[in-house]
Amino acid sequence: MVVYNLNRGIGWASSGVEYAQAYRSEVFRKLGVEAKFIFTDMFQNENIEHLTRNIGFEDNEIIWLYTFFTDLTIAATSYSLQQLKESFSLPIDRTEKNGKIISFFFKGSSIVVTVMLNDESSNIVQRVEYLMGGKLVRKDYYSYTKMFSEYYAPEDIGPCLYQRTFYNEDGSVAYEENVDGENSIFKFKETILYSKEELVGYMLEKLQLTNSDLILLDRSTGIGQAVLRNKGNAKVAVVVHAEHYNVSATDETTILWNNYYDYQFSNADSIDAFITSTETQTKTLIDQFKKYLNIEPVVYTIPVGSLSKLQRKEWHERKAFSLLTCSRLASEKHIDWLINAVVEANKVIPELTFDIYGEGGERQKLQEIIAKNKANNYIRLMGHKNLSSVYKDYQVYLSGSTSEGFGLTLMEAIGSGLPIIGLDVPYGNQTFIENNLNGYLIPRETPDNPQQISTAFAQYIVALFNSKDICKKHEYSYRIASRFLNDKIIENWSFFLRRLLNDYTI
């Protein structure tokens, strides 16, 4: 039995989906269940191994679509600059170094080889670009050996990618991809595939799936049809990570599904089970399937994360009046609302501090808001860090998100005993915040009024720190968190796998 977890991408600032998969990988290891995590995006700027290892996966758990058809294994980049130099056929005339970029110039040739190292102090090669007459013609990508090459044709608007060649360990060609804008044709010795979707289907065919295997769809945009067509005898389950429908566009007769789940829901008769993270979402989904589609699919509730232990630290040992939030710095997380709230609350409690963990596209905007309010001395952007032992140094957690399918950081926050202030929205906040017991759920009125919301957050921040029972709220967070300890989630997954696969040895 193998559980194949299907996703698209992963990055340094990963989303909750990737963190949910990382938690799941730990559970499957403890259950002794073989699990593979398949990523189907193209990775050019970073070796996928660095990204998956960073979040907690083991190398032998990872399948990358593009190296699946080669004999390469997932491994950290180790190809050295010396190895590359030994491969040059022309004598080096001179070199130029700028940070982690080294350029080689050759005697009597217009060829320039530009090398991107892992970092400035490293001699490990990540990518090599070949320029001829100042025009880009090829890029090579490395891990412990050359993984693939890209070939470019010069055009007026810049270099145009037209081909990728993927290699085996001995340097032989495994297959080629002909690229025409967004379209690709994949050429193998034995077959030709006319789309990426067909490539995914071919991978599943090669896996020779049996009725003891399971495919868990975490993300399936653009590949859902290929999965259902090529699943063989394997079971298929869909993991719902977010709000699954558009509330404002749904009425008594029509529902608008979240486009990430529309294909799966529309083909629910081909899905063996759905998984949500909360009982509330499970009930909502079951009711909606019955009402709008007149079907009764199997829906399980399994939290996407779990806690290995409660991170204990007494309230008075934490930094006084300290707040934090942790998320991607994205517009839907509404960190700007929280910054403005803390600025307002700071006028009442000047000792307040607010640390914001995470990275993302909103970083510059948020930094400007902090600077505009002259709040640099008490509001900080902390970047992306491992927070497992950080939460317990703080006293209160803030959540500005208007929708969380589960909210892993919320779970981690209460696991460290933090009261939480957040909006009264499904599903994470309503799962981890019990109003007045371990924090506050702020009523949300639509459309959102950012100023009113920030003011409400400020008022609740002040109220919480002035509360005489704040230590009780701190302890109540631990009480809620105990429901999400590893043993409980392991039992949930064990029950699910036994039932779905009819395998009671798990």
Curated annotation (Swiss-Prot):
Q: What would be one Gene Ontology cellular-component term for the protein?
A: cytoplasm
Q: Which reaction does it catalyse?
A: L-seryl-[protein] + UDP-N-acetyl-alpha-D-glucosamine = 3-O-[N-acetyl-alpha-D-glucosaminyl]-L-seryl-[protein] + UDP + H(+)
Provide the binding site for N-acetyl-D-glucosamine: H241, E404, G405, F406, G407
Q: How does it sit in the membrane?
A: Peripheral membrane protein
Pathway this chain belongs to? Protein modification; protein glycosylation
**Enzyme Commission code:** 2.4.1.-
Gene3D superfamilies the record matches = Glycogen Phosphorylase B
Q: What is its main location?
A: cytoplasm
Protein family according to the UniProt entry: Belongs to the glycosyltransferase group 1 family. Glycosyltransferase 4 subfamily.
Tell me which PANTHER family the record gives. Answer: GLYCOSYLTRANSFERASE (PTHR12526), TEICHURONIC ACID BIOSYNTHESIS GLYCOSYLTRANSFERASE TUAH-RELATED (PTHR12526:SF629)
Q: What does this protein do?
A: Required for polymorphic O-glycosylation of the serine-rich repeat protein Srr2. Catalyzes the first step in glycosylation by transferring N-acetylglucosamine from UDP-GlcNAc to serine residues of Srr2. Part of the accessory SecA2/SecY2 system specifically required to export serine-rich repeat proteins, probably Srr2 in this organism. The GtfA-GtfB (Gtf1-Gtf2 in this bacteria) complex adds GlcNAc from UDP-GlcNAc to Srr2 substrate. This subunit has low glycosyltransferase activity; GtfB enhances glycosyltransferase activity in vitro.
Q: What is this protein called?
A: UDP-N-acetylglucosamine--peptide N-acetylglucosaminyltransferase GtfA subunit
Q: Which organism is it from?
A: Streptococcus agalactiae
Q: Which gene carries the instructions for this protein? A: gtfA
